[in-house]
Amino acid sequence: MRKWAILLLLAGLHGFGWTVQAASCPTPEEFVVAADALPATKAAIGRRALTILTLGGAATLGAPAQGTEYTYPSRLKARLAEALPGVTINMVVLAVPRQSGVDLDLKLSAELAATNPALVIWGAGASAAGRGDDLDTFIGSVTQAVGKIQSSGADLILMTLQYAPSVARVIDLPPYRSAVLQAGEMASVPVLDRYELMRFWSDTDFLDLDATAPETRVLVARKLYDCMAEILSKAIVDAVH
């Protein structure tokens, strides 16, 4: 059970006739991105070509879902393509599990230069929490990476680390969640609070994040990633409307 939970942790526009699918994943409150928070994304959509860089740990690769088509980046691409007809969506995945801040900085610099994304979506904190990294050091590395992303001209959406009950019993997750929220507030970038979303889904039995049956684990992972994609796609499209 703990292995599965740790895998989870580490692991349109109306004017143009664009629409967003109706929500099927319950949320305690709607994730809203301010209208002026995604200027590069809006400009890219206007050019009918949007490149998104998804940055995170093992969860970005979505191994528990057993299929790349079920990962959250793949599901986000599919949902945005449906919501934004006529716009080419290029989804770049940079998974950096268990990497140091220095390694992340080097890989991020190279990927920003190579792909020139309009939007970066970064789920930070899982590896740092697993290692028990010093919080000030973690906040510093996140702040540095945020500055690099913003200096490149890309928009940014941060995400807090993921939650699972069995992981929360053995790893102190809340300080790293708070650190990402703090970094987002300091940089004035939107933050999707995955930790609270997943805790809500667990507490309301919407998702069994500690499922043990293999078939159930796969189904839970696929639903989890699709829910994240649903919430992100709606927020992005609403923001550039």
Predicted regions and their residues:
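Serine-esterase "nucleophile elbow" of acetyl-processing enzymes
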Residues: C25-V93, A110-N116
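Boundary at the C-terminal end of the N-terminal hydrophobic targeting segment
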Residues: G17-S24
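Cell-envelope and extracellular/periplasmic
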Residues: C25, V93-Q99, I121-G130, E185, ...
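Catalytic His-Asp segment of secreted/periplasmic serine-dependent ester chemistry enzymes
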Residues: A164-H241
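Active-site segments of SGNH/GDSL-like serine hydrolases
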Residues: I121-S127, V146-R177
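Extracytoplasmic/secreted cell-surface and envelope-processing proteins
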Residues: G62-P64, G101-D103, A128-D133, S166-V170, ...
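Internal alpha/beta domain cores that form substrate/cofactor-binding pockets in large enzymes
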Residues: T51-T54, V87-T115, S127-L158
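Bacterial N-terminal signal peptides
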Residues: I6-G15
